[in-house]
């Protein structure tokens, strides 16, 4: 997302056009190019390429490919492999497919739905948008569904903090932010950095706010940025590299204030994001093994891998020519013996040290969308204790509406205790100063998703701590021998997004195909 945001903003500036226009044009160009490549690739697979891939380089035994992890990344990878004539076996520890792409159904009145995990899709997220189109799954435009005249509410220091006031405050740090962006360059990686980029990587977001914002982190703008980037990455801002703030906030235009730069969170899949998972799984059904967890990986002398799985009390080995690891590093580090995997020292450093954010989602349903009557679109940020909200039901039928209280870091970690009802009551007391009268419209329905307690992810999504851009960023997705890696945690541009899963799943599939056919 970040690299794409950088180039989009740069093109818009040079051409003196709106960012949305550039996004739309790129989507059309990308779709046309992808359609062309898809037709050529599938035609080749149907004639000369597929037999070569199935038979392997030498024309002998088929290449044995194993994909470990049946989340969105692993399923996308296996789906693209199958289209190219490579039938991988997919192993998943959970009994459910999809990982963090998982829709809530049946919990709310009027048939309304919510997402357990990944929810919003940017306009620039072309990989997942094109996959959804290929699977004939329409997307709903969340921004177009917002009632005219509604806007985001900020509430800090005991009072409303208006959008014009926030824009004025941002103007005060504009030159500093853009000078940092220019001098840092994008991206900053373990093998690519400038002096300023390396310097900022050694600072935290909190440090940079205190240095650049008048009044520091105790000012209204400072508090807003602290809350926004806490929930964005699921960690306290004093733990995160300052570059994570710069590479989003830096892509605003003069007089504009988008907290997350070019990220506009415009779409979601109509009827639930996990329909992508379902559609992929139908195509791959005979290849998927569930309830089977990876416990060890060993690189053999011939370059093959022996991977050890556990299914209940049974442990067994599988030998593969190619292994795609499509599960979070938090799981690899915690649950898998990699002492004989033969990975590079830098890869092992990333596996051990890449941080996993803590985010929780409290979805609360109301009998009507009272926030719209107040002039609010459902998006709020505040320092009253709940952190942030957005409306889950934009574009949904019915009079009821759902707000999600989205928390990160220390606050998110507290959601491992309490009931949905008690947490909803707490939230309503905290949000009442921002949306007065809301409490009276709660219909008694609420759900909690506590991602730090999820045994299959051990957190919400990845982020880089102070110093980690220059320490190992960029190695996460790099091929290591005959091992390939995918998942949002291996994406530079779309870390933390469903897009990151799809984009890297396709990348890993491309690597395998190139090697097998090479």
Where are these regions (language model features)?
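Active-site/ligand-binding neighborhood in enzyme catalytic cores
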Residues: 20, 189-296, 311, 319, ...
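N-terminal glycine-rich phosphate/pyrophosphate-binding loop and immediately adjacent elements
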Residues: 61-186
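Generic structural signal for small/hydrophobic residues in well-ordered secondary structure
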Residues: 72, 98, 132, 209, ...
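Conserved flavin/dinucleotide-binding core of flavoenzymes
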Residues: 84, 304, 310, 335, ...
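Mobile amphipathic helical/loop "lid" adjacent to a hydrophobic cofactor/ligand pocket
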Residues: 2-13, 133-135, 140-248
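N-terminal secretory signal peptides
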Residues: 1-32
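Central helical "cap/lid" subdomain
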Residues: 298-299, 310-373
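N-terminal export signals
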Residues: 29, 34-57
């Amino acid at each position: 997302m970040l690299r794409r945001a950088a180039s989009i903003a740069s093109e818009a500036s040079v051409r003196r056009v709106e960012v949305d226009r550039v996004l739309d044009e790129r989507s059309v160009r990308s779709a046309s190019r992808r359609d062309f490549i898809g037709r050529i690739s599938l035609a080749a697979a149907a004639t000369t390429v597929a037999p070569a891939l199935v038979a392997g380089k030498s024309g002998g035994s088929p290449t044995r490919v194993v994909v470990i992890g049946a989340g969105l990344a692993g399923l996308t990878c296996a789906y693209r492999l199958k289209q190219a004539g490579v039938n991988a076996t997919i192993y998943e520890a959970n009994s459910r497919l999809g990982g963090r792409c998982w829709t809530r159904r049946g919990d709310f009145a009027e048939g309304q739905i919510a997402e357990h995990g990944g929810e919003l899709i940017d306009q620039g997220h072309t990989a997942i948008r094109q996959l959804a189109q290929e699977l004939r799954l329409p997307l709903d435009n969340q921004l177009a569904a917002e009632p005219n005249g509604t806007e985001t509410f900020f509430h800090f220091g005991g009072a409303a903090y208006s959008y014009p006031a926030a824009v004025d405050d941002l103007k005060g740090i504009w030159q500093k932010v853009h000078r940092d962006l220019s001098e840092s360059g994008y991206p900053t990686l373990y093998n690519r950095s400038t002096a300023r980029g390396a310097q900022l990587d050694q600072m935290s977001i909190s440090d940079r706010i205190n240095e650049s914002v008048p009044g520091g982190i105790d000012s209204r703008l400072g508090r807003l940025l602290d809350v926004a980037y806490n929930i964005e990455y699921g960690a306290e801002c004093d733990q995160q590299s300052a570059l994570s703030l710069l590479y989003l906030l830096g892509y605003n235009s003069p007089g504009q204030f988008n907290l997350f730069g070019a990220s506009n969170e415009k779409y979601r899949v109509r009827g639930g994001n996990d329909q992508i998972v379902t559609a992929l799984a139908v195509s791959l059904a005979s290849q998927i093994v569930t309830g089977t967890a990876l416990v060890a990986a060993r690189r053999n002398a011939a370059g093959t891998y022996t991977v050890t799985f556990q299914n209940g009390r049974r442990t067994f080995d599988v030998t593969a020519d190619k292994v795609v690891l499509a599960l979070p590093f938090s799981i690899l580090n915690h649950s898998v013996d990699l002492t004989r995997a033969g990975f590079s020292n830098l890869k092992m450093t990333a596996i051990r040290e890449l941080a996993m954010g803590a985010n929780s989602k409290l979805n609360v349903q109301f009998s009507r969308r009272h926030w719209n009557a107040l002039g609010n679109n459902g998006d709020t940020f505040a320092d009253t204790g709940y952190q942030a909200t957005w409306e889950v039901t934009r574009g949904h039928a019915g009079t009821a509406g759902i707000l999600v209280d989205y928390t990160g870091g220390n606050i998110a970690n507290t959601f491992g205790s309490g009931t949905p009802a008690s947490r909803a009551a707490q939230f309503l007391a905290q949000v009442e100063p921002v949306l007065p009268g809301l409490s009276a419209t709660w219909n008694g329905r609420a759900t909690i998703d506590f991602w730090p307690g999820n045994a299959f992810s051990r957190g919400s999504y990845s982020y880089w701590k102070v110093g980690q851009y220059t320490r190992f960023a960029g190695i996460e997705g790099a091929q290591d021998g005959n091992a390939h890696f995918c998942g949002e945690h291996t994406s530079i541009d779309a870390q933390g997004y469903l897009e990151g899963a799809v984009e890297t799943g396709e990348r890993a599939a491309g690597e395998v195909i190139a090697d097998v056919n090479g």
